[in-house]
Each structure stands twice: as C-alpha cells, then as structure tokens.
Amino acid sequence: MLFRSSQRSSAAKVSPITVATKEAFLERIALIWPVQGDVSRGFEQDATRRHDGIDIVAPKGTSIQAAAEGEVIFSGWGPGGYGRIVILQHQADLVTIYAHNHENQVQLGQLVRQGESIATVGQSGRATGNHLHFEVRHKAVPISPYKLLPYRPSNVAALDRG
C-alpha cells in the first residue's frame, strides 16, 4: 500500500543501515523496465564520463511505465538538459527519474502503480534522439539501474561502469 509521507508514523525507530545491509535490501526491490528498447548508453561513474542513468532508445510516443509503485514528486520541465521529467518517490528512500519525455501523463502528488503509464518517450531537453534517460537514486545517490532491473540479454552490450 502506498502512503504519503504525512501519513507515515514517526513513532517507529529504525537502526542505521550498513553498506552490506543496504546492498541486500536493494537487491530485494524489484523494478520493471520502464520502456522496451535497446540501451544506447550505460551507467558511468568514473571521473571523466559521468552518466547517472541509462538511455533506452524507443520511438517517439512510446509509453513509459512506472518501474515501481510510488508517488509523483515532480512532473514538469527539469533542470539542466533533462527536458520534461517525471520523478517518483518509492519505498526505502528510492527515487526513479524519467527524462527527455515527449509528454508527461502524471501530476504532482499522484500515486502510481508499477507498470502504469506515466509519460511518453521523446527528445526534450538536450537529447540527440528519441529515448528515455532512466535514473535510480537511493538517498539522493545515483545507483546503477541494472542492480534493480531484471536481466535482459539484449542490453548486455551497453557499458555499465557503476
């Protein structure tokens, strides 16, 4: 069940999560691919070529689905070169970002289910072609989407330097 942050109980105390516990916890979160298509650029965190997400090529207007249930915390024109973006807040301080959209289909505060259409593929912002730029962040830190997405052999060729 989804809860707004104002509905969550503040009475429960949670002990700090260690790095090992965090990795084990994140492995249990099952995201779905937000769009079908080939990955044209992977996740990179080295000093010279930073890319905080993956780029998935798809035709303009293709439906983008919520990778997990969550609440829309942003839907509009994003900062920098992101163009139209949707940002979803999920359980356990996990956030997913969907960028370069042609059209956003959700509104701030809306609760969405996993697999629900939230936007369509486009090339808004600084994009060189129609694709979805997809990011996953845990407590504001970018993590490789591949850690949470099901394995797809067609995407093995894309670099992932996370």
Predicted regions and their residues:
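Surface-exposed, glycine-biased beta-strand/turn segments
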Residues: 6-83
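Short hydrophobic beta/alpha edge segments that flank linear recognition/processing sites
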Residues: 56, 84-88, 113-125
